[in-house]
Amino acid sequence: MAAPALTPSSVSRALCALLLAASLPTGTVHAQEIPPPAYQLAAQRAGIPSAVLYAVALQESGIRRNGRLVPWPWSLNVAGQSRRFATRSDACSGLQQAMRATPHTRIDAGLGQINLGYHAQRFTYPCDLLDPYRNLAIAAEILKEQHTPGEDWLLAIGRYHRPAGGEPAARYRRSVSRHLARVQGTRTTGAPHAACQEKSP
């Protein structure tokens, strides 16, 4: 018996079926990523979701290590330039040097990139912000303050970055929402299915 002839439409349907099948394990649901204990503790104390705190830290201080994006505690942002240090001591020296040459409102430090100028009342010594536990406690506190009961946490996340809101807050929300989807193990895209729907007769 002769094999059935292949037509462009049958090839297209076959490719779409393969694409959909390949996308099901990862395109529909991702494995949930449980935030490390320090994030869970800080979030619990502040009364906020630990996934929200972890997603913010991934956005603020995330670096690639061993193929994974992880928050880095000894991170600074000085006048828009990210700086990473190998140790807390090195980061503290870098912070002190930056403070001598840069307005404090243009310096962010630690896991949650706490601003030295706008949040000066939240710490005693600037290098305290390089203590991961202290930094997370402050970040969680700020998120809690920016959240209105009953609203989506993404709105509070936007105000964490820019309390006045606007487009900078919206851009930040979009970036953090991708990290949040990864942490929560939720679907991030339906592109393969949509693409096949467009081509189906």
What does each model-found stretch correspond to?
Residues 1-4, 199-201:
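Short, intrinsically disordered, low-complexity terminal/loop segments
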Residues 3-16:
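Bacterial N-terminal signal peptides that target proteins for export
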Residues 14-25:
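Bacterial N-terminal signal peptides
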Residues 27-31:
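Sec/Tat signal peptide C-region and signal peptidase I cleavage site
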Residues 32-201:
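Catalytic glycan-binding domains that act on GlcNAc-containing polysaccharides
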